[in-house]
């Protein structure tokens, strides 16, 4: 078993981070550098790949400095990343030919509307995804269609495509390795998750040459070596951030579920070695530990959770800092009958209504901002239940424990209400850096830094467990009222347009 430490590279939507772990999965040092978002037109969201790379290198140096280690002490590197974000670069010079098109970018909606209308079933059956600008496929097509000479260069093999993990590994290996893992490939809308290969029919449909795509490898594997830090270090782990978080929550068994509470919420359920195709949820690859053998997941995305707290802070100016919401909400015993539906941009799973709009209902003369604060926190828990109920139904598996992470999971009031409204235990781990920890685990397994999943399970520790404290009748009464509130928000924008 090698000694030393594992370096986890965690490249997010607004910052590049690096975290150093030891064999007990303790965090020894964290580096973080923000980089700007670029909005050249309405609906466009871009990053400059050079800014990402520079921020990432600074974050690595900062983490190593804080951990008081040198590059020769790094046993392996894992890379986790914001998913779907798309970069095309020149295969010879390594220079990006355009900015990275970010997962939030909506410019390709005309392409995906056409796919939805004509090829919805085929794409869902092959990729587990629904045609949406969110995924990489339509972004690649847009660059090939809109930049002069790029398509002809791509057809000659002079262009490379990658999600952020692929680009960083390419840069770390000085252009020697062009690779991604199963989890990231499954977010492109180009990867057949049944056959575990790039899908030629979809590639032909979008006119994307297969030669630009990376090799797809297991999430725990030695892809190559980097020398940019001063020593030769294996790059041995790669996974998209939400899948890495599921792995970091040691959710290795079928039916285990985690929810990440961020700006939105991502709920993933391990569904084992056979995909389940759902009407309301995405089917995705969680990870692959061996070639041609993967673990699948069901994924539900909630658009607005933590963002509702930001709106309460910045839009209403009701609090000075996001952390102020918990004590304010705790100053009242309940919401006083107030329900808040945060449909600022429509509703995601399981409603899928882009015309829904936000509402606050149940206000009386006695309602205070504390009641609204509490209703905002409770709306996060209700939305999680909406998705978890669908997961149970479509997987045929009863969920008994919800593992939680992300900024919102630090809020004890919210986590207690989450347990109350689900009627199950909610478990928060000691180390909340679950995405970076997950990819550190994947990197360590590939180089025998750790020997087994069982060993990793032993090292994972719980910070706090939340047990349901209300009875079933009360739980269902509140949840039914939530569903009634949601019903009143549905189709609002459309109903205005018809008048």
UniProtKB/Swiss-Prot annotation:
First-level EC class: transferase
Gene Ontology BP annotations: glycerol catabolic process; glycerol metabolic process; glycerol-3-phosphate metabolic process
Residues given in the record as sn-glycerol 3-phosphate binding sites: 13, 83-84, 134, 241
EC number: 2.7.1.30
Disulfide bond residue pairs: none
UniProt binding sites for ADP: 13, 17, 263, 306, 407
GO molecular function term, any single one: ATP binding
Alphabetical UniProt keywords: ATP-binding, Glycerol metabolism, Kinase, Nucleotide-binding, Transferase
Protein residues bound to ATP: 13-15, 263, 306, 310, 407
Residues holding glycerol: 83-84, 134, 241-242
Listed InterPro entries: ATPase_NBD, Carb_kinase_FGGY, Carb_kinase_FGGY_CS, FGGY_C, FGGY_N, Glycerol_kin
Superkingdom of the organism of origin: Archaea
Catalysed transformations (reactions): glycerol + ATP = sn-glycerol 3-phosphate + ADP + H(+)
Family listed: Belongs to the FGGY kinase family.
Function according to Swiss-Prot or TrEMBL: Key enzyme in the regulation of glycerol uptake and metabolism. Catalyzes the phosphorylation of glycerol to yield sn-glycerol 3-phosphate.
Record-given protein name: Glycerol kinase 2
């Amino acid at each position: 078993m090698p000694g030393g430490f594992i370096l986890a590279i965690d490249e997010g939507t607004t910052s590049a981070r690096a975290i150093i772990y030891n064999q007990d999965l303790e965090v020894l040092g964290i580096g973080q550098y923000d980089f700007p978002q670029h909005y050249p037109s309405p609906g466009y969201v871009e990053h400059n790949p050079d800014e990402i790379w520079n921020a990432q290198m600074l974050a690595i140096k900062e983490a190593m400095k804080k951990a008081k280690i040198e590059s020769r002490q790094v046993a392996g590197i894992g890379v986790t990343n914001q998913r779907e974000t798309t970069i095309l670069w020149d295969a010879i010079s390594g220079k990006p030919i355009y900015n990275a098109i970010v997962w939030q970018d909506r410019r390709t909606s005309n392409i995906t509307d056409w796919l939805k209308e004509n090829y919805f079933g085929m794409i869902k059956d092959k990729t587990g995804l629904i045609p949406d600008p969110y995924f990489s496929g339509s972004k690649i097509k847009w660059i090939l269609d809109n930049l002069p000479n790029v398509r002809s260069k791509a057809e000659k093999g002079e262009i490379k495509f990658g999600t952020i993990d692929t680009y960083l590994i390419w840069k770390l290996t000085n252009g020697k390795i062009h690779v991604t893992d199963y989890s990231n490939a499954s977010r492109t809308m180009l990867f057949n998750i049944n056959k575990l290969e790039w899908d030629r029919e979809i590639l032909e449909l979008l006119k994307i040459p297969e030669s630009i795509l990376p090799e797809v490898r297991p999430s725990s594997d030695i892809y190559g070596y980097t020398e940019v830090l001063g020593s030769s270090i294996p790059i041995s782990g790669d996974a998209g951030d939400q899948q890495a978080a599921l792995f970091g929550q040691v959710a290795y068994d079928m039916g285990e579920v985690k929810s990440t509470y961020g700006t939105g919420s991502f709920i993933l359920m391990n569904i084992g070695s056979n995909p389940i195709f759902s009407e309301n949820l995405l089917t995705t690859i969680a990870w692959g530990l061996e070639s041609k053998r993967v673990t699948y997941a069901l994924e539900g995305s909630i658009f607005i959770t933590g963002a509702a707290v930001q709106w309460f802070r910045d839009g209403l100016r009701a609090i000075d800092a996001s952390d102020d919401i918990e004590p304010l909400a705790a100053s009242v015993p309940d919401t006083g009958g107030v329900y808040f539906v945060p449909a600022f941009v429509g509703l995601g799973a399981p409603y899928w209504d882009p015309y829904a709009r936000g509402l606050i209902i149940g206000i009386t003369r006695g309602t205070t901002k504390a009641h609204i604060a509490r209703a905002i926190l409770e709306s996060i828990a209700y939305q999680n239940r909406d998705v978890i109920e669908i997961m149970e139904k479509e997987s045929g598996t009863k969920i008994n424990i919800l593992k939680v992470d992300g900024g919102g999971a630090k809020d004890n009031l919210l986590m207690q209400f989450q347990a109350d409204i689900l009627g199950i235990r909610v478990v928060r781990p000691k180390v909340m850096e679950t995405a970076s920890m997950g990819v550190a685990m994947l990197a360590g397994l590939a180089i025998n830094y750790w020997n087994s999943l069982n060993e990793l399970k032993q090292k994972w520790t719980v910070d706090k467990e939340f047990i349901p404290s209300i009875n079933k009748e009360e739980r269902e009464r509140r949840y039914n009222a939530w569903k009634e509130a949601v019903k009143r928000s549905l189709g609002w924008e459309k109903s205005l347009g018809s008048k």
